Amino acid sequence: MKRVLVRAPLLSQSGYGVHSRQVFKWLLSRKDVTISTHVLNWGNTSWMVNAEMEGGLIGEIMKRSGKPDDKGFDISFQVQLPDEWDPSLAKFNVGISAFVETDTCNPGWLEACEKMDCIIVPTEHIKKTIERTGKVTKPIYVVSETFPDEMLEPDVKPFPLEIDTDFNFLIVGQFTGNDPWNDRKNIFLTLKWLCEAFSGDKDVGIILKTNHGRGTRIDRQITSKIVRDIVSEVRHGEFPKVHLVHGNLETKEVAGLYKNPAVKSLVSLTRGEGFGL
């Protein structure tokens, strides 16, 4: 049996958190490893602490958690930004990261790659961006993101939406900045352009599933104010209506949101490559 360490934001409500849990779930399916977890923060995002969540996966993560002091691991999987990887944690160290969403990479991160034994990225785009930035001698593998089986289940119940608009655009993403120019997901301008394109159309609605980093009541108040301020500035009149969906949803609820018959189109105008995890 190989001793494996997963160092990652395994409990975080974030894209990196989802990616981390994908790695852990795969390792959990193997019979030839014993797993330890070193759970990290990811920005100011909330943590999942209910052991029953994700079909019990959160509980499996928590009961293996701690901050390991020994270096006796055979393999480490580290889901972080490259400059946060620690090549001393195991005999063989795997760095996993989404790196960048655009076509430019920090040259310093290539040095971090050279200290690991191999690198895993989610797309060919990211791999090519790294290789275009400079020479990396360590192998880089592309392992795509996955999506939950619930997304394909035909009997998923539509997520309840109290709306009265017939044709609705769905936007899913977190506010990652305080103005249109530093928001990576580009939600500010997405709202602006949809309001301009469908100005005065009472049959069109915009469903915005978002937050400002957390799923709390305080975050909802902050997020609601941001959305109100944006809409008051970019929308002339009462239409299109903007409907806010906030809070942490179970996987089946997210699937139900996508499958709600009121949702006719998914809109993503993110500034770079994005997955909406």
Q: What label would you give each PLM region?
A:
Residues L5-R7, T45-E131, K252-E253:
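Extended catalytic core of nucleotide-activated donor transferases of GT-like folds
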Residues G256-L277:
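Acidic donor-binding loop of glycosyltransferase active sites
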Residues D117-K128, V136-E153:
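Donor nucleotide-sugar binding/catalytic pocket of nucleotide-sugar-dependent glycosyltransferases
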